[in-house]
C-alpha cells in the first residue's frame, strides 16, 4: 500500500520568468484550504446553481490513496487547491480543482502535480465530473488530454453533468 505520509513532494513552476507557483501536499482542514473550498463553492453555485459540496468531504482525504494539495504564489499565499481520491484500486477521481485566478498557470500546475502524484500512487486513470455549463472547466480538461466518458457513479442519469477520463502514462 502506498502512503504519502512522510513524503515531501514539492513542485515549482516558473511562468514567464517571473511568477512562481509551488504545489505541495497540504492539510485539507487548514484555514487556507477552507477559504479556497468556500471560494470554489461560491463560484460553482454562481455558475451551476450547485456548490458541489455534496460530493466531497475533507474527511475523505484521510484515505491513504487520497491527496489534498494547495498551490501557493511566490509570497506563500494559497491561490489554488485540488484533490484526488480513490474510486477503485486503479482509478482516482479528481476533485475540488480551483484557482483564484490571481496568478496565471495555477490550474495547469495543480493538474500536473496531481497527475504525477496519482501515477506515483499506482493509479492508471483519473476521472472527473464537471457541469456542461462550466465551459472554462470543460475546455481546460479537454485541452489537457481528458476525453469524454459515460457518466459514472453518482453522476449517472444527471444530464447537467459531464464526465472525463485520462489514462496516466
What function would you assign to each model-found segment?
Residues 21-95, 99-102, 111-112, 117, ...:
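Acetyl-CoA-dependent GNAT
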Residues 8-15, 55-58, 151:
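Intrinsically disordered, low-complexity boundary segments flanking structured domains
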Residues 102-103, 136:
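Active-site-proximal flexible loops/turns
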Residues 21, 29, 69, 124-127, ...:
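C-terminal "cap" of GNAT-fold acetyltransferases
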Residues 109, 113, 135-136:
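Alpha-helical macromolecular-interaction surfaces
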Residues 2-31, 169:
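Conserved N-terminal entry element of GNAT/NAT acetyltransferase domains
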Amino acid at each position: 500500500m502506498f502512503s504519502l505520509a512522510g513524503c515531501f513532494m514539492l513542485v515549482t513552476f516558473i511562468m514567464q520568468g517571473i511568477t512562481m507557483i509551488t504545489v505541495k501536499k497540504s492539510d485539507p482542514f487548514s484555514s487556507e484550504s477552507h477559504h479556497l473550498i468556500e471560494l470554489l463553492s461560491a463560484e460553482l453555485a454562481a455558475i451551476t446553481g450547485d456548490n458541489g459540496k455534496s460530493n466531497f468531504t475533507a474527511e475523505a482525504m484521510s484515505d491513504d490513496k487520497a491527496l489534498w494539495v494547495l498551490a501557493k504564489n511566490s509570497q506563500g499565499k494559497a491561490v489554488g487547491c485540488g484533490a484526488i481520491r480513490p474510486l477503485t484500486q486503479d482509478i482516482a477521481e479528481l476533485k475540488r480543482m480551483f484557482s483564484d485566478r490571481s496568478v496565471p498557470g495555477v490550474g495547469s500546475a495543480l493538474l500536473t502535480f496531481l497527475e504525477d502524484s496519482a501515477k506515483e500512487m499506482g493509479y492508471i486513470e483519473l476521472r472527473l465530473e464537471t457541469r456542461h455549463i462550466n465551459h472554462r472547466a470543460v475546455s481546460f480538461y479537454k485541452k489537457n488530454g481528458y476525453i469524454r466518458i459515460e457518466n459514472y457513479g453518482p453522476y449517472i442519469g444527471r444530464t447537467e453533468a459531464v464526465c472525463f477520463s485520462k489514462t496516466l502514462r
